[in-house]
């Protein structure tokens, strides 16, 4: 009863996607981001969702496909929200604090990249750019996301690549295809980059993540990162 009371009080502070107070929503306790806080059997109730969740936990990546307008991006985000909420519940001593921090945790742990035909390997992984009149090598958006993730964080991070079919995946992803595999996540995949061309401020961040070894740069995808 105490746990349910805490949940009810925190629900009053939350809103749904359309701005409606979550507490006024129909059956708020069954909301996908709330239920994991009180129902340990959540993953056992929906065989289809269980299958997707099990697959994602095992492979750490998943592609949702189908015609435009079939809620692929929505489903991807809901799956991420559910897994983050479940992890937050399991790793929080205080249920009230966990629910209060839920929205901030979702915002910091779900990374959405809108793909488009002009996306390049340089934009996505690493490549040359001009900085103060000099040509330098800078990490792309994916490498920046990886740099910002705490590898010891028990709450998973999710990268949602929206409209991925609009890019040449082989050309844009490069070494990421291999680095995403579980067997490569600890050792990483070497990138064909001269680290002397990388700005010093970027070098430190990469070193802190263990991505530079023997003057070589490695693409290392954290084990707590899902696609």
Regions from the PLM with identified roles:
Residues 44-227:
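AAA+ P-loop NTPase catalytic core and its hallmark functional loops
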Residues 2-46:
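C-terminal accessory module of base-excision DNA glycosylases/AP lyases that mediates lesion recognition
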């Amino acid at each position: 009863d105490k746990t349910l009371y805490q949940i009810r009080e925190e629900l009053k502070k939350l809103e749904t996607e359309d701005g409606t107070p979550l507490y006024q929503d129909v059956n708020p306790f069954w909301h996908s981001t709330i239920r994991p806080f009180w129902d340990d059997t959540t993953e056992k109730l929906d065989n289809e969702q269980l299958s997707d969740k099990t697959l994602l936990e095992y492979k750490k990546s998943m592609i949702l496909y189908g015609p435009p307008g079939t809620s692929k991006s929505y489903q991807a985000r809901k799956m991420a929200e559910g897994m983050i909420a479940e992890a937050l519940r399991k790793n929080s001593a205080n249920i009230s604090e966990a629910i209060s921090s839920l929205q901030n945790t979702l915002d910091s742990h779900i990374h959405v990249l809108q793909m488009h035909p002009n996306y390049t390997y340089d934009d996505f992984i690493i490549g040359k750019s001009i900085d103060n009149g000099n040509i330098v090598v800078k990490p792309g958006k994916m490498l920046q996301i990886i740099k910002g993730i705490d590898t010891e964080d028990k709450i998973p991070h999710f990268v949602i690549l929206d409209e991925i079919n609009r890019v040449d995946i082989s050309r844009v992803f490069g070494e990421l295809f291999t680095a995403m595999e579980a067997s490569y996540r600890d050792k990483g995949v070497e990138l064909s980059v001269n680290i002397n061309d990388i700005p010093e401020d970027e070098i430190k961040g990469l070193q802190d993540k263990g991505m530079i070894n023997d003057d070589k740069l490695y693409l290392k995808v954290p084990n707590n990162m899902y696609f």
